[in-house]
From Swiss-Prot:
Protein name (Swiss-Prot/TrEMBL): Uncharacterized protein DR_0394
Gene Ontology terms describing biological process: threonine biosynthetic process
InterPro entries for this protein: Aminoglycoside_PTrfase (IPR002575), Kinase-like_dom_sf (IPR011009), Pseudomonas-type_ThrB (IPR050249)
A GO molecular-function descriptor: homoserine kinase activity
Family of the protein in this entry: Belongs to the pseudomonas-type ThrB family.
Domain of life: Bacteria
Disulfide bonds: none
Length: 342
């Protein structure tokens, strides 16, 4: 007699899924397959790939004999072909004017980038020169060298006015990030209202200063981790994925934001920021509006970063972007505004 407690076996039809039919958000590409692509499109002999970083894009070190290069595979839908082309043309422009950057390397057919077909859709890829050197340290000496480098970057970037790239304007820095955050903040109305208010105050302050702000092509992500220092004290820059025409004061404020969000105290950060900004101003002037806007662009950067992360909740998970994430951001903005508000 059959056991009445036993559930009958479920009869299901066989379903077949393939990598092409099941959608993905951000796949991990096999390094052996990428090595084959690199060998074919760049003419490198027996390249070996090591994944260095999986962030907005995927960055790998490529070793072919004694030669070392960097391969970036952009995330699907992150940049249009025109935007990728702008970034690579900007790098070529800077290199041509003597700025030490990780320049793009052409494929065997002369193109600066290609497109591969991943599970989630087309993904652009590009090869870059490898920048030797050590990471910048949190010392006034390194901060000053970085400030000089930033001034040289802006000097060299002034003539570059090519179209085809998103602008690092207040819509990009404040309006769009809030739009990305709002779906996650519905669970935390006590945090949503003060975050919206902080963004409104930041926007009002920067809008008032906007007529006097310097504008031009920017790196867009000018924190110290995107630089290397050679034994000859030459600073090289890489990762121009967030570059675009924008406020020069914002470009500088990214370094300040990076320092103050590393858990250092104000007494530790201030000498670094003073050295960075002082070295920049020795080489390149800033307007009164630029100087007044710097702390407000730190707040804008904090909001931009929160929106950047919130926009990828489906990939990172909402537990990662839960209440503690937004509380940390709001606490930072509140404390920052108390020290540097209008």
């Amino acid at each position: 007699m059959p056991d009445a407690r036993r559930r009958p076996e479920r009869q299901t039809a066989a379903v077949s899924f393939s990598a092409r039919s099941f959608p993905a958000l951000h796949s991990v590409l096999a390094p052996t397959a990428l090595a084959g692509l690199v060998s074919e499109t760049y003419g490198l002999t027996q390249p070996a790939l090591t994944l260095l970083r999986r962030g907005l894009n995927d960055t790998s070190r490529v070793q072919s004999g004694e030669r070392r290069t960097i391969l970036r595979v952009y995330r699907c839908g992150w940049r249009t072909p025109a935007e990728v082309g702008w970034e690579l043309a900007f790098l070529q422009h800077l290199a041509g004017r003597g700025v030490r950057v990780s320049s793009p390397l052409p494929r065997a057919d002369g193109a600066l980038f290609g497109v591969l077909d991943a599970a989630e859709g087309p993904r652009a890829y590009a090869m870059f020169e490898y920048l030797p050197g050590r990471a910048l340290e949190n010392t006034p000496a390194d901060a000053a060298l970085y400030g000089q480098c930033a001034a040289g970057l802006h000097d060299a970037a002034d003539p570059f006015t090519a179209p085809g790239r998103l602008a690092l304007d207040l819509n990009h820095l404040l309006t769009e990030p809030l739009r990305q955050m709002r779906p996650l903040l519905t669970e935390f109305p006590d945090l949503a209202a003060p975050l919206e208010a902080a963004a409104e105050r930041t926007q009002a302050r920067l809008t008032a200063l906007a007529p006097g702000l310097s504008w031009g092509a920017c790196h867009g992500d000018l924190h110290e981790a995107n630089a290397r220092l050679t034994p000859e004290n030459e600073v090289g820059l890489f990762d121009f994925d967030c570059a675009g025409p924008g406020f020069r004061a914002y470009d500088l404020a990214v370094y300040w934001w990076s320092q103050v969000t590393q858990g250092q105290g104000a007494e530790e950060v201030q000498p670094l920021w003073d050295a960075f900004l002082g070295a920049y101003r020795e080489r390149r002037p800033l307007t009164d509006a630029d100087l007044a806007a710097l702390p407000h662009f730190v707040a804008a950067r904090a909001l931009w970063f929160m929106g950047l992360m919130a926009g990828r909740a489906a990939e990172f998970g909402t537990e990662t972007l839960g209440r503690p994430f937004f509380e940390f951001g709001l606490n930072f903005l509140t404390e920052w505004e108390e020290r540097h508000g209008a």
